[in-house]
Amino acid sequence: MSDAQTPRPRYKSDLIYGLDDRPHFSAAIFAALQHVLASFVGIITPTLIVGGVLGLESEVPYLVSMALFVSGLGTFVQARKFGPVGSGLLCLQGTSFSFISVILSAGFMVKARGGGTDEILSTIFGICFFAAFIEVVLSQFIGKLRKLITPVVTGTIITLMGLSLIKVAVTDMAGGYGASDLGAAGNMGLAALVLLTIVVLNRFNNPFLRLGSIVIGLTLGFVVAWWMGRVDLAALPHLPLISVPVPFKYGFSFDWVAFIPVAVIFLISPLEAAGDLTANSMISQQPVKGPLYINRIKSGLLADCLNSVMAATFNSLPMVTFAQNNGVIQLTGVASRYVAYFIAGLLVLLGLFPMIGAVLQLMPKPVLGGATLIMFGTVAVAGIK
């Protein structure tokens, strides 16, 4: 069946720029910035959690830089498509929260036997390096599993992912997990301001307002939060000017006992990735059945594998296809794969120059929650449709 004959999803996303369109530079960089702002926290949070819980605070700034650096490289691979590797879609790469518990378990296992920082990290990255190849095997059977990857199955997965993300967004709107002022009126007011700004701007027919709705909403929220005294620029950490990527900086170790739980998650994560890629295809007005669709899923999983291997090599946690940016595509109407190149470049810069990322980390949780709630809501709606 040719691409032209492949059925398209009956889903209206009202795109300004389609998958193969090339937006002019200003539109592309503006759209890319919104994807980065929407996904930045999700990319670095697993690293912050793992580093904090395992007591690796001294290495966290470097690990965060590498998470952003590898996310940029992985996003480029996924969108650019190198032979059979890469879906060719505007898909960001980041670490799934499902990996956190098993990685923490591996870290505590090494710590219990007296292992230091280097041994903990070398073991984590070593087992993730080998476990990533499981996705290569699974990707080869995607064609045979097409009867299982039905619209009902993928739609259910997408909806559940959207609902789980909505929970995160609502928590952020209230002030963030563990906040002393959780649910305070000031937090909810900031979140409502950002959310309403994005919704109102999306009602205009002006492409610029729609394209910039997320950046405008976040900027307005950040400025108001600063005016309210909720942004402390003095809290910026003292970081090196440049973080240099060093392959296997902490060494390379392996542990069978720690490997098995991580391998199990790698067996499950392709199903989540298939849902993310399906949602992206729907919103990008691409087929969600037929040979082209199956090949995209297969190639996307291969890219996830390569990116996870690359992540372990450059001292970062496993990389998978992110669901967060699907909502950005729908809100902005920009599905162009070429925008992914700009996203990749911005993420690499954030990784190499950690001070930029540190400034973005000052974004108050309610401001971010107001923007992500509407984006994650569109992911859930895509699954229902």
Across the structure, where does each feature detected by a protein language model lie?
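Flexible hinge motifs at transmembrane-helix junctions and intramembrane kinks/re-entrant loops
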Residues: S2-A4, V53-Y62, L182, G186, ...
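Intrinsically disordered, low-complexity non-transmembrane regions of multi-pass membrane transporters
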Residues: M1-F30, A234-F248, M282-S299
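Short, non-helical or kinked segments that cap or interrupt transmembrane helices
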Residues: S58-L63, P84-F99, K147-G155, R210-V215, ...
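Short juxtamembrane and helix-loop transition motifs at transmembrane-helix boundaries
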Residues: R22-F30, V50-V60, Q78-S87, V110-T123, ...
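Membrane-embedded helical hairpins/re-entrant loop segments and their flanking transmembrane helices
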Residues: F25, G51-G86, V264-R337
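Membrane-embedded alpha-helical modules
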Residues: F108-A234, F342-K385
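N-terminal signal-anchor module of multipass membrane proteins
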Residues: S2-L90, S101-R113
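Hydrophobic alpha-helical segments within and immediately flanking transmembrane helices
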Residues: P46, F69-G74, G94-V110, L160-L165, ...
